[in-house]
Structures are given as C-alpha cells and as structure tokens.
Amino acid sequence: MKQLHVQRYLEKVRSRKQHFLYPLLFKEYIYAFAHDYGLNGSIFYEPAEIIGNDNKSSSVLVKRLIIRMYQQNYLINSINHSNQNRFIGHNNYFYSHFFSLMISESFAVIMEIPFSLRLVSSPEEKEIPQFQNLRSIHSIFPFLEDKLSHLNYVSDILIPHPIHFEILVQILQCRIQDVPSLHLLRFFLHEYHNWNSLITSKKSIYVFSKENKRLFRLLYNFYVFECEFVFVFLRKQSSYLRLTSFGTFLERIHFYGKIEHLLVVYRNYFNKTLWFFTDPFMHYVRYQGKAILASKGTHLFMKKWKCYLVNFWQYYFHFWSQPHRIHINQLSNYSFHFLGYLSSVLRNLLVVRNQMLENSYLIDTVTKKFDTIVPVIPLIGSLSKAKFCTLLGHPISKPIWTDLSDCDIIDRFGRICRNLSHYYSGSSKKRSLYRIKYILRFSCARTLARKHKSTVRTFLQRLGSVLLEEFFTEEEQVLSLIFPKTTPFSLHGSHRERIWYLDIIRINDLVNH
C-alpha cells in the first residue's frame, strides 16, 4: 500500500516532466520505508537503529526539525536553554544524533526512488536476472586470473577522501534537479558539521559515514561515479589515437566543462598539452575506496596516468596534490591486497627438451600465473580487534558471549569459521586457513570453559568431535568428493585448487578490518 502511494506520486511527477522529491519528506509512509526493507528490499541495506525506540519517525516531527534547523542561531539557543526546552531534552547530543539519523535516512530514501524506478522501468529489465552472478565479489577474480598474467605494471589507487560536502552536493545536482531538496541537503550537511565541531572533536567525514550510512553511501557512490566517468572518458580518448612512425600514440586530450548535465564531458581544467602512450591492454577494477589500474605498457605510461589522475583530483575536486595515493609497481615483483586477498603474479620457469632427428636442445619457457593467498597476519589482527585472540594469535575467550547457550556459542563460532572458509575458498594455499580455524576453535573452547568454570581440556575431550564437525566446512566436504584419495585433514596442507563462488555479495567484517 505504501509503495503504491510512492508510485502514484512519481507517475504524477513524471507526467509533468518534473522532479519534485521535496514534498515526499512530508509524507508519512516515507518514514516507514526509511527504517525497514519496504522500498528496495535490498540485502545491502541495513535499517538504521534510531536511538530510543519510543521516538517514532513522523512527518510532523521532521517538519518541526526542519523549521528549527532554518531558524537563526537555534543551536546556540538550544544549548543555553536546553533545560527549558522539552522537545530537545536534557541531552543536546542525543537530539542532534536522533535528528541527523531521521533526516538523513528519509532523505536518502527519497533520493534513491528515481534511480530505483529508472532501473526497474529500463528496457533491459528482463535481462537483469541473467547477470545476477556478476554481483558476486568472487566474479572479479576469474577476470583478474585471465587478464593480469599478461600485464606488466599495476597501480594501487586509493580514492581521495574526505571530500568537501559542497562538492558532493554539486555532484548530486547533476542528476537531481529538485532545488528545495538540494538546498535542504546542503543546509543539513552544514549544520551537521557544526554539531560535530561543537559537540565532539571529530570533524572527519568518517564520523558522518558511520552514523548516516545510507545517505553517505548515496553521496559516495555519486562521487565515485564522477571519478570513474572521467577515467573512462580518458581511456576511450587514448584508444582513438593514431599510430606514428615511432610506434607510439600521441594526442592532445581535452577536458570538457560540465555545463548542463553529467553527460557533457569535461574540459578547460588543464592548460598544458597532455601526452598519452595508448595501451589496449589496460584494465581497471574497483571495490569500495580502493582501485587497481593494470597495464601492459611501460613504467612511463603508468606515470603519465598517475599524473592525470592527481591533477584531476586537484583541479576538479579541489584536493591538494595527493600523488602518494597512487603506487606503481611491477607485477612480477609485487603482491597487492585487494578484496581481502593477497594477490600476485607468479613466474614459473619450465625447461622443455626438444628432439629433432639426431639433435636435441633445451628451451627455457616462462609461464605466469595469477595467485591468491590468505593474508594471515591481517586476519589475526582482525581477530584480535574482535577479541578472539591476542595480537600474537593466541586464542582467548569471548566473555560477552558467555550468557548465551552452549549451542548458540558453538553456532556463532562455527558460522564465522564457515564464512571465512567460504570467502577464502579461492586461496591457493589452504594451510593458511588452518591457523585461523585453530584460533576460532580454541577461542570457542575457552569461552565454553569460562562459562562453566571448567578447563579447556575438559571441554575438548567432551565436545571434541562436535567442535570438529562444526568447523569442518562445506568446501572441504565438496573437495573430498572431487578428490576421493585425499583425506579431509590433508586438504588444509596439500590441496591447492581454487573455488570461486557466485553468491558472495559482501566482504566479511573480519576480512574488511
């Protein structure tokens, strides 16, 4: 019923060829969507937990908050007279936090509506289910296996942050022409920055991203889209160049100005002539705030791309020059962290004897293979942060879980272990996972022993087989069927086959620490 209201309103807006999203802020059903899965049903979105379940979101409350936000010096007056204002309450930080969550979640919902409907109403709607497997994170690795083994250099790129809020609003303005909504967003972000500077000492955008996840993801995705749009434009321009007698491609690249909308490409940001060595074997992969640019070209070619990106960040997004965010390395001598894996290109030297009639000779052949392994030390650091072990990897108990039942404790530890094994099924060295499983298994035993005030040895003797079965993953069972001669216990050390799954759509929290 609620979704029907939204669709009717948007059909009316679409018939008038207008994009008025601001009135939706004052529709009661929007605030039900803002805190459940109602609108998009996406598993990527986790509903926000507003402080205090008794404080229900409503259009009346939001209207009051917006009016107060527009009042002059209301924040200073509210701090000085907080005891006299029942609406704000005794804790101004509670009020500001509650206000920011409510407004940001609702604002993000109405901003997502046009793009969600655009996707649903697209002519390719029937073809979308055929490509659901491409959503899997593991679908990236077969691509890297096929491409990186033929390339020479790789650039690790950290997308610049934090970005100024005003730049984010200007980027969003290219897609949404609703002036009142953008004005409210700009004012809200400005006031939120003032709250952080008055109430806390943290002024970074990191604070905003932690407390307003949905709105931050929306703004951040627009920002990344802007970066990649220009990057793709430059890549296409460099591929259209003509071949010279020296075997290089030279061309002047122009940046077009953003005049009317985002589809007009960029210009007038560089006054100098920019030179490119084109390379048909260039590949770009990004996840979250990190990207990889790999090429078969020379080191000079990669340095020119680095120069382009740094200048683009500086002139278009008004960043200070940040060349340290791009590191160029030779693939044959470098291992890079990406999506929780430690990846590299291995060189194997093969000697082949060739026999021709009475003569024989040896041929040295070099083969390259893309390799992925488990980064054990970072994972142990993540387990240490989560209080499963010490910094040295010694298992410790989890006191916060001692109030749970024995089955729940074993199930939680087993689920973490299975998720990690499932995600790292693409590792060529399964032995690295054995240490992680050892830590989780003994942490589980120590937690149970702490709960029952007993010793670890007692519980290992009593629940040894149960714990072993709980930490024995489905991947190992599948591999034992594929390789019947290999025992389950030797899979940790001897098996090197990699399995990529097409149902992994997010990184485990322990992987992403």
Swiss-Prot record:
Keywords of this entry: Chloroplast, mRNA processing, Plastid, RNA-binding, tRNA processing
Single annotated GO MF: RNA binding
UniProt key word Plastid: yes
GO-annotated biological processes: mRNA processing; RNA splicing; tRNA processing
Keyword Nucleotide-binding: no
InterPro entries: Domain_X, Maturase_MatK, Maturase_MatK_N
GO cellular component term, pick one: chloroplast
Coiled coil: none
Location(s), subcellular: Plastid, Chloroplast
Role played: Usually encoded in the trnK tRNA gene intron. Probably assists in splicing its own and other chloroplast group II introns.
Family from the record: Belongs to the intron maturase 2 family. MatK subfamily.
Protein name (Swiss-Prot/TrEMBL): Maturase K
Gene: matK
